[in-house]
Amino acid sequence: MVPLSVLDLSPVTSGSSGTQALRNSLDLAELADRLGYTRYWLAEHHNLASIASAAPEIMIGQIAARTRRLRVGSGGVMLPNHAPLMVAERFKVLEALFPGRIDLGIGRAPGTDPVTSLALRMRQQGSADDDFLERLQELLLLETRGYPEGHPFRNVQAMPST
């Protein structure tokens, strides 16, 4: 028999929410595990109202905790959006918690539009505390959608929308 896998973007259906899309993904993974699927992949996309899959490593942990034998992985983590050390550490933690069941798939595409890509990658360089207050303010603005009119990140939204 050919091994079967699922690639899940956690789609947000019309009239639903990102929260429900994530719950649907958890349910689908449990079903895939019961049906004998081999692997469950989670995608990384940002600032898309129709896709709730912005943080695959968090969902990987949730799915691995709710299933018994299914391998769970990222399909994929968009490496340009992350510090490689952080990716390695996150997946090593997942592997320590769920030995032999975690897969790391990586990609090079941004997984988003150019403006959101800029928001994801800005200030990845510099010293640890040079711009802490600026980063804190940016985090608050993203959480509250508080960028002023005309700001390039005005339409960038932390997903999923709940």
Model regions and ranges:
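Flexible, glycine-rich active-site loops centered on histidine and acidic residues
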Residues: 3, 7-18, 80-147
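Glycine-enriched alpha-helix->loop->beta-strand junction motifs that scaffold or abut catalytic
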Residues: 66-69, 98
